Regions:
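Basic polycationic patches enriched in arginine
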Residues: 4-7, 21-22, 33
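Conserved short alpha-helical segments that host acidic/polar catalytic motifs at enzyme active sites
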Residues: 29-304
Length: 307
């Protein structure tokens, strides 16, 4: 019910942008207090295809979730670091900037379309957010309730913030935890899982996260609490995995999905899919075949947008 109301309000904003924002904020604040979703769109991909066009196509199916700004981050295995491209305004601005993704090379990445909650609509506040030297790059849907406390603690450690967002606090906190695990004899995956585990314990609020680590090309991480997130298991032709805030984003590429549960973490590569609980214990999750087409998925399986 909440999801359908939320989509209806997003539709109203698209049709009547001058008059719907106040209604939207009333409803979205209620949803946040009661564990519902905050509207932003997340897409991620790792596989054998070029990631940027896939990310942008997926985001076009999630644009009802936000059109204040959009961005993508893509890693080319031959490049020294992750490339981040962001644009203020509707997704078409980002598509023009990147030649519909063709100008950004690499087979692993994350994308985001934003409806502003903390920080004004701007390129600086757009996702993805990144740490120094892009050691950690992160997209987020939700609200980090204790972001100010985290921000102040990180500033005392010498971290410098570029944006006004709660998401950057989560990104730099994850970077801090990841850095602390260096030299401890852990594998890169173990370090990442430990850092994400600590983040999930420290952060209060709702979140769905898509994460890239600069020293792990081709690996895509995801985690969630009280904000929706799925894994798409791509066809042999695409040979890889996706993440998304909602089913429509992946239906152009696969009908097979895994629903990430609350307090769960996903680690994805082109060939492997691992799901963990918050204690970093690997768990089995069923693959669900979506029977709807893309148009029906946008209505969550219902016949109409309105009841």
């Amino acid at each position: 019910m909440e999801l359908r109301i939320c989509r209806f309000i997003a539709f109203c904003m698209s049709a009547y942008p001058s008059g719907a924002r106040r209604v939207y904020w009333i409803h979205i604040n209620w949803m946040n207090r009661n564990g519902g979703c905050i509207l932003c769109g997340i897409v991620g991909y790792t596989g054998c295809c070029q990631a940027a066009p896939i990310l942008l196509e997926g985001l076009t199916r999630l644009e009802y979730r936000g059109y204040d700004s959009a961005g993508i981050a893509v890693r080319d295995e031959g490049a020294p670091r992750i490339e981040v491209v962001k644009a203020k305004g509707r997704l078409k601005n980002l598509m023009e900037m990147t030649d519909s993704g063709r100008a950004v090379r690499g087979c692993c990445g994350v994308g985001h379309t934003r409806w502003a909650t903390h920080g004004e609509p701007s390129t600086v506040n757009a996702h993805p957010h990144d740490s120094k030297d892009k050691r950690v790059v992160l997209v987020h849907n939700g609200i980090i309730e204790n972001h100010q406390e985290i921000r102040e603690a990180l500033q005392r450690k010498g971290y410098v913030f570029k944006s006004q967002t709660d998401t950057e606090a989560a990104c730099l906190l994850l970077d801090s935890y990841y850095a602390e695990s260096m030299g401890g004899g852990l594998s890169p995956r173990e370090r990442a899982l430990d850092a994400i585990h600590r983040l999930m314990i420290r952060v209060r609020g709702s979140y769905a996260l898509g994460i890239l680590f600069g020293d792990q090309p081709g690996v895509l991480y995801a985690a969630r609490k009280d904000s929706p997130l799925i894994v798409g298991c791509c066809s042999e032709e695409m040979h890889g995995h996706m993440i998304a805030s909602d089913v429509p984003a992946v239906l152009g590429f696969t009908r097979n999905v895994v629903y990430i549960g609350n307090d769960e973490i996903a680690c994805l590569t082109r060939d492997e899919r691992h799901i963990y609980n918050i204690d970093c214990e690997e768990i089995e999750k069923p693959v669900t075949e979506i029977q709807w087409d893309a148009a029906a998925a946008e209505k969550d399986g219902y016949e109409h947008f309105m009841m």
